[in-house]
Amino acid sequence: RFLKEDLSVKKDSSVPQILIYHTHSQEAFADSREGQTEDTIVGVGDHLTELLEKTYGYQVIHITDAFDMMGGTLDRSKAYDYARASIEKVLEENPTIEVVIDLHRDGVPDERHLVTQVNGKPTAQLLFYNGLSYTVSQGAVSYLPNPYIEENLAFSFQLEYQAAQYYPDLYRGIYLAGLRYNLHLKPRALLLEAGAQTNTVEEVRNAMEPFADILNRVLKGSDKEG
């Protein structure tokens, strides 16, 4: 049923329809240069923004705020809270936004390298991370309500379906976690893990090209089963 849900968006390049941000803005890669924002996940977000705007004609807002820095020190303890407050304000000011992407990179054992080949280029593999506001130990996490759990899952499933058709080795799957991760902000909200700390900047940037393609396919409503 997730594949049959209509998540298409009527494109209007005159208004912002996609929002990209980074709860963990300091995430970097194997060959990142210290102090160079373009070598972090924020730089990857810049590249994704450019692809979506120049190749596919969407208007994108990219928030580059450092929600995981406090007084110049890395502190992720309240990053999701800080991000939520900022994103809610942006959404209120831009009601045309339909898609919200929290772009991260994963953390894996140092010997693991999440890479494949796409169009002859080394490309970091991707993972969708979905929060269920539910844990085995306590059941529903009532203080983290999310009215869009099913829509969030449908969005991830449809993206994964498109990936399986066009880039079968690109995706690592969908990871189901117990909390909310600010996915309650929109039905088409996504937490995307692009590669990991063992990938190069180039590999992760390369992954944005196929991701932008499958995102556009889902938003167009094309090639959907059923």
Go through each PLM region and give its residues.
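Active-site-adjacent mobile loop/cap segments within catalytic or ligand-binding domains
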Residues: L170-G226
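Solvent-exposed loop/turn segments at secondary-structure junctions
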Residues: S25-A28, A66-M70, R105-D110, L132-V136, ...
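A short, glycine/acidic-enriched catalytic loop
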Residues: P109-P145
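Catalytic-core regions of hydrolytic enzymes
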Residues: R33-L48, L52-V115
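Active-site-adjacent substrate-binding region
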Residues: Y148-Y175
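Soluble non-cytosolic domains of exported or imported proteins
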Residues: G35-G43, L74-D81, N146-A154, T198-N206
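Soluble periplasmic/extracytoplasmic beta-strand elements of cell-envelope proteins
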Residues: Q17-H22, V99-H104, L127-Y129, L191-E193
